[in-house]
Amino acid sequence: MDINDVKSIIAYNASSIPVLFEMCRIAKIAETVNDMVEWKSDNAKVSPGFLIEVLVVTIMHRRQPLWKIEEYWRKQKLEFMLEDSGITVEQLNDDAFARALDKLQTVNMKELVSRICLNMLKAHNLTIESLHLDTTSISVEGLYEVDEEDDFIICYGYSKDNRPDLKQFKIGAAVQQSGLPVMGQLLSGNKSDREWNPEAIKEMKVFFEGQQYRDIIFVGDSATVSSYESLRQLEGIRFISRLPENFSCVSEWKEKAWQGVNWEEVGTLSESSRKGAAEYRIYEFVEAIDGKPYRFVLVHTNSLREQKTKTLQKRWEKEKQELEKEAKRIGKRAFACVEDAMRESAAFMEKVESLHYNVEAHIEEKVSRKYSRRGRPGTEDSYEETVSYYVKHTIGERDDMACEKDLFMESTFVLITSVMDRDRYPGWRILAEYKGQSSIEQAFKFLKSPVYLGPVYLKKPERVEAMGYVFILVLLIASYLEYRVRKALRDRGEYYIQPNGQKSTRPSVRTILEVLETVLVIYFNGNLYLPNDTSPKILKMLEWLGFSPDIYTKKINVIF
């Protein structure tokens, strides 16, 4: 090999890029986009589907401001992976991505995302038995023209980001029982969960039945059944939700449970036997609401008790301080007779005792003299004596039994379901399905990672909406990366060793991407090579993902 050959050898960090592109291929993102949007393959240099695919990979791989993408991919040596495709990095510029987003906005993006989600579901031979749905808010900065007639409006609303100072839009999504996305929808920033949840469930039932997915159980938080009207909307639909406290029967049933019911001990629901895992007990019954029978599962858990103890202690401390202030104010008032003082004391003590605090009271008598003339009184000066009565209260500790009852009530909640088959879905399984709601909350955490959008992507609300659907595709790819690795670990009885030496069977998508971050690839004479000394940790992660090392030596197959 001469010196010129050595100079033509280039080593670069391929990172997770080939893996992410392959995941997009499995999802058929480019094909689905190209099939749904209007574009002319003979005129377009790069298909809109491939541009959307590149955008997904960019967002997942790059945790930096999302603009000047062309420069970014040039630094990543993407031209080596695109070689022989007829596409250059220069064609992957911000304007091209903006045009692709504009094309995306012309189609039913909710349907597009659902199609892609089902592609992944079928590729992994998975089913839909239950769906968990929820929303999250995405805060944005900038000025936007608002058309009140639009279905999608960037505006102020209840912020789940704790940023009420910023305008926002919302993302509603649903995941199946394994926590994998099956639908996503962009919502106006002020869209209420109470409106969206029942609406979305009705729409999803129709859509998925059309795809031959039947008898799905829909699981949502208490916003799903916030009113009698919400329950009417869900008639004929299998659902599980938490009955909110605004239904008076909830407090009545909790009170009944406090008095004593035949609890069924469930124990832990966690897959692991980790110390401190939440333990549950349940009590089942059937009652009618608005003339329709439902199953109810009363649930008590020690985990909520631990969470609520500090909250309640703060509440009780503040409550006692307020009572002591009121007692002090009353203690400064002068009463003309004992009866008046006792009457005032009785009213206050009734209030204190209703809040379950111990209280003691005593009346003090104070005699004051009023002399007939001003100045220092003499021994012979006449005076008039006035007797006043003051009532003093001492606020004691709160009654132990009352504290215990409050903790019980706060640690107990009521599940409602229209699934009446107790044999197939006993109470513990209804609870387990509801607790699976955390899977979508975990999925949303990945969307909360900072992704900064450049000016071209925020130029108009329609483009922001299209970008929001790209975020849902990012969530899809991230979820399946986790699923593939975790399933492989579970099936093989293996585990991932974390940097701190701990074993894990549930590595996060961030961990997976971090392991692949240092993959080095050699480019020489038009070919790609993976060095022989590639870290075994990287090779093992590829194995868990279901890919061979060859994924790094193949060029990207561009979809036109």
Predicted stretch roles:
Residues A27:
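Substrate-binding/specificity loop regions of serine endopeptidase catalytic domains
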Residues M1-F21, A30-F560:
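Anion-binding and metal-coordination hotspots
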